[in-house]
Amino acid sequence: SLKGQGAPNVGQQVRDLWYAQRDADDGCTLAAGEMVAQKKMTEDEVWRRARQSAEANRQKAVRDAVAIVAPEAVGQVAELFASPAKYLAGQSKSRGKERKELALLAIIRMASSAPEAAAGQIEGGWGAQLSSDELNWAWAVVGKQTAFKLQPEANSYFSKVRRDADLNDDLLGWKVRAALRAGDWKAVRKSIEAMGPERNESTWAYWRAKSMLAGRPSAEDRAEARQLFEDTAGTGSFYEQLALEEIGQRVTVPPAPAPLSAQEKATARSNPGLTRALYAINAGLRSEGVREWNYATNLHQAGGLGDRELLAAADLACQQQVWD
């Protein structure tokens, strides 16, 4: 149960589910509020949810998060979304940490459309008022938006981040991309090593190994890079295949899967999540149906459906002439 005392790590479970949601959800918001009240989640974690939602342009999700930690400031969310520049130039009604976090939300919103202007706000005075954590996040968001536009200044903005541990994996991923474009292998390695579990994904494992071989690698770096390539090598993804080539093996076409059995097809047809998804799509609710399909195949059970189950689901979709 997520209510009451619950499991020892219930706060982390709620936080992770909440962070994974792009849109606001009343149930998760209520659970997050309870976790904060029980001191199983921190206010900093709630503000981080607000930052992520501001970047995704989800005003209600930002408002819901702010309502947990600063209910008297909820009205300011609409103001900073409507005109970040005007909000930053005005006299804030809040003080202390609340004031700085709201200013950071405004900088994040500004960066989404005008990263150079957001950088100007940071350098023009707000940077001196933000905490080190807030400042690092602000520069990272500016760097991300600049990198997204393939502008050469991106790595320079990211270099202003003084502590990678203050960033989430999404921002660190963009920091890596900017560093790769700039040929900054030291930053590539440092940023990937600061990631959470995502660092073990084939993409980042491959680039981490490559960063270890840049410049003048030590024997230890060479050995560790080789081990990473060996652990990553395979045929399941692009970077797995690149890692395969790095250890001197050829990429070959995997054998065709065995035909689906009648039982496998029947299991797919009886899957309630897939059934709901196809029903919604056939009823004209395509976006809802696709969302239900993605949940049924990827999220309903830990690790998602297996390869054979996915193949059966794809076969079912083809029979219904659903191609996406």
Per-region residue spans from a language model:
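Cell-wall glycan-active module
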Residues: 1-324
